[in-house]
């Protein structure tokens, strides 16, 4: 009898909880303000999400935008997510100082990135942002371009054996190794030689990004206990990758700490030339940063600056391979500037006199943004149109759809670098072209990323003609934009 009563009590409480969730969903302030994709009470959009895969996510959201408009909402068990590609709503969300908390799904990254700049909030975020910002000062970026140039030269040499014009080359993994060498050297002052060796660190980074991409697509895997229960092999591999990278980072931190201690005894200590040096010299309230704080920031920098640059550079080279006239125009600009000396290095001041290169990069980022969506979790109510989005709601910004909106860009699917020189550029609203997000919590390293991207593209185009070979890209969103079919080109040495 007691068991029956306990079961009845549990069932009653469950029904009551479900009723409250259903009522919360029906009374949500967004109901009637933006369309809802949810058709089944409580279950909400979960039924539609069963078909979501990295390879079709961009098409699914494009379909929803077409059916429901630029902004819509979905629910799962009473939890509401608003999705938007509407510039007015994006402006309201990103521009203020009150909506700085990252979306809930980002916290799957905490095991690797800890409380680094991507995931921190409040005073901690403001403090670290202030400490890290000087790392991207002009004088330090100038030193970083030397690293970009040297590692890009190694990439160019590695491509030489593939440049006979009759072989399809998936450029993505090759660019990825160069980007990893660049990010580790600029972040930590060490070279992992990813382009020349089969590194354990390289494998760990690849494993973690692949696992995290899968978790982002499956909401139940965002919860640590369910992740461990439902995907034990993925959980174990993620743990192994995190341990590998944390041990690597901890070792480098100790090495750099000893180096800086020796330099402190010299008359003229060297200037900081890596993010790690800046962090080791920094203090908060008179106290140095802890090893964990430093490790979290370095790992965040590597995570944010590796795959994103790989994606950006690879898709840019792909577009150039498919648009011969654009590639030739860019090559002519580079030849006019650098002449026929293929060994002349790239320096920061070069980019001020290469306007078409800038347009090519901007247009490539518009068509293939490395991060196709960003998210915020509201810290206070946000007023939009005739209603408001309540505190605690996750809002997803569809950069992919925004940057391909025909109401904003003429012929949005056409690769047209000239649009960034012509009449179209000045009439864009501030929140229409935001491949690096926008507002106070935009990408802190966007200048770094653009310079790295320009350097790598410059080096490759000066050495090789890119040919339209291999399968076309099939976009796949795994946190960062990738391609299911590879990012394929052909290569032929330039004739001067």
From Swiss-Prot:
Species: Drosophila melanogaster
Residue numbers binding heme: 443
Name of this protein: Cytochrome P450 4ae1
CDD domains named in the record: CYP4
Alphabetical UniProt keywords: Endoplasmic reticulum, Heme, Iron, Membrane, Metal-binding, Microsome, Monooxygenase, Oxidoreductase
Family affiliation: Belongs to the cytochrome P450 family.
Topology in the lipid bilayer: Peripheral membrane protein
A molecular function (GO) term: iron ion binding
GO cellular component: endoplasmic reticulum membrane
């Amino acid at each position: 009898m007691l068991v029956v009563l306990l079961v009845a009590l549990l069932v009653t409480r469950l029904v009551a909880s479900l009723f409250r969730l259903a009522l919360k969903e029906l009374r949500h302030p967004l109901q009637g303000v933006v369309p809802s994709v949810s058709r089944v009470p409580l279950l909400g959009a979960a039924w539609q999400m069963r078909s979501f895969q990295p390879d079709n996510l961009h098409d699914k959201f494009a379909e929803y935008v077409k059916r429901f408009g630029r902004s819509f909402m979905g629910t799962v068990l009473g939890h509401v997510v608003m999705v938007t590609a509407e510039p007015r709503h994006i402006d309201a969300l990103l521009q203020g100082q009150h909506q700085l908390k990252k979306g809930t799904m980002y916290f799957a990254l905490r095991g690797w990135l800890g409380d680094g700049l991507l995931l921190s909030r409040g005073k901690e975020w403001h403090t670290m942002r202030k400490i890290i910002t000087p790392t991207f000062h002009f004088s330090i970026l100038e030193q970083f371009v030397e690293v970009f140039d040297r590692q890009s030269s190694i990439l160019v040499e590695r491509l030489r054996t593939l440049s006979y014009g009759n072989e399809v080359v998936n450029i993505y993994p090759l660019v990825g190794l160069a980007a990893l060498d660049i990010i580790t050297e600029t972040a930590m002052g060490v070279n992992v030689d990813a382009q020349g060796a089969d590194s354990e660190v390289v494998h760990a980074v690849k494993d973690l990004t692949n696992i995290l991409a899968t978790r982002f697509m499956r909401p139940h895997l965002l919860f640590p206990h369910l992740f461990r229960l439902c995907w034990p092999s993925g959980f174990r591999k993620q743990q192994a990758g995190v341990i590998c990278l944390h041990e690597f980072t901890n070792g480098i931190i100790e090495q750099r700490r000893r180096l800086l201690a020796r330099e402190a005894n010299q008359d003229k200590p060297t200037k900081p030339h890596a993010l790690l040096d800046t962090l080791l010299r920094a203090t908060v309230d008179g106290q140095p940063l802890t090893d964990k704080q430093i490790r979290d920031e370095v790992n965040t920098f590597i995570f944010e600056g590796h795959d994103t640059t790989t994606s950006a550079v690879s898709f840019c080279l792909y577009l150039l391979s498919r648009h011969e006239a654009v590639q030739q125009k860019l090559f002519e600009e580079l030849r006019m500037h650098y002449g026929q000396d293929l060994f002349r290095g790239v320096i920061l001041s070069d980019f001020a006199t290469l306007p078409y290169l800038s347009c090519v990069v901007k247009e490539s980022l518009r068509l293939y943004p490395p991060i196709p969506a960003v998210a915020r979790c509201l810290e206070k109510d946000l007023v939009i149109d005739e209603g408001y989005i309540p505190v605690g709601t996750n809002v997803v910004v569809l950069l992919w759809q925004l940057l391909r909106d025909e109401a904003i860009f003429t012929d949005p699917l056409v690769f047209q670098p000239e649009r960034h020189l012509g009449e179209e550029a000045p009439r864009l609203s501030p929140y229409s072209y935001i491949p690096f997000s926008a507002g106070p919590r935009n990408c802190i390293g966007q200048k770094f990323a653009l310079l790295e991207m320009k350097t790598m593209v410059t080096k490759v185009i000066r050495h090789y003609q890119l040919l339209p070979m291999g399968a076309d890209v099939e976009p796949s969103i795994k946190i960062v934009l990738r391609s299911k079919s590879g990012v394929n080109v052909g290569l032929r040495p330039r004739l001067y």
